[in-house]
Design a protein with these regions (language model features):
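Juxtadomain coupling helices with adjacent low-complexity linkers
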Residues: 89-90, 107-149
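Helix-turn-helix DNA-binding module
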Residues: 104
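Residues at secondary-structure transition points
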Residues: 23, 27, 63, 124-127
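Sensor-regulatory modules in signal-transduction proteins
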Residues: 98-101
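Short, basic/aromatic recognition patches
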Residues: 49-96, 138, 142-145
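Short clusters of small/polar residues that mark proteolytic maturation junctions
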Residues: 8-10, 86, 110
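Amphipathic alpha-helical effector-binding/dimerization core
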Residues: 1-51
Length: 149
C-alpha cells in the first residue's frame, strides 16, 4: 500500500529530500499515508495490510501490523501526523488529511524540513508549521466540498 506524490513545492533553501512528483512511499511510513490510515478503523487497517510485507525505509518505520495500529491510534487522537526521519533519516514532516465531500480521506499534505525543526512538537516553529498544515488541509478539503464535522 503506497502513497504517490502528485504535487511538490520546494523552497529556495537547500533541503536534501529525494521526494519528487511520482515518488511512491509505503503508506504506513510516510506522513501523508499515516494521516489517511489514521482516519480508517482498525479492521480496515488490518485488512489493508493483511499478508503484506512491511519494508521501512529506515529502522524506525513500523515492522508489523501491531506497530502500525499503535501508531494509527496516536495519529488519530492528534488529528495530524509528525514524522521524524521515518522515510529519510534527516528529514521531518507534519501532515494533515484532505477529505472529499463525503468526509472520506482522499489525500494529505505535508511540510517537510530538517528533522531538528520537527523533533520538538511544542517549539514555536513546530506549532507554526502544524497550524499552517492543518489550515491548508482544511481549505483543500472545503474546496472538495467537505464541511467540518
Amino acid at each position: 500500500i503506497e502513497v504517490v506524490y502528485l504535487s511538490r513545492e520546494t523552497p529556495k533553501t537547500h533541503l536534501v529530500s529525494n521526494m519528487h512528483i511520482g515518488s511512491r512511499l509505503p503508506a504506513y511510513a510516510s506522513s501523508i499515508g499515516r494521516v489517511i490510515i489514521s482516519e480508517l478503523n482498525e479492521t480496515e487497517v488490518k485488512n489493508m495490510f493483511k499478508n503484506k510485507e512491511l519494508k521501512g525505509a529506515t529502522d524506525i518505520a513500523p515492522k508489523n501490523i501491531e506497530e502500525i495500529l499503535s501508531q494509527r491510534k496516536i495519529d488519530s487522537e492528534r488529528g495530524y501526523v509528525w514524522s521524524f526521519g521515518m522515510i529519510e533519516e534527516n528529514i521531518g514532516s507534519c501532515a494533515a488529511t484532505i477529505f472529499n465531500y463525503d468526509g472520506i480521506p482522499v489525500g494529505g499534505l505535508n511540510v517537510s524540513g530538517p528533522k531538528d525543526v520537527f523533533v520538538n512538537e511544542t517549539s514555536k516553529e513546530a506549532i507554526i508549521v502544524k497550524e499552517a498544515v492543518l489550515e491548508a488541509a482544511r481549505k483543500a478539503s472545503e474546496a472538495m466540498g467537505f464541511r467540518s464535522r
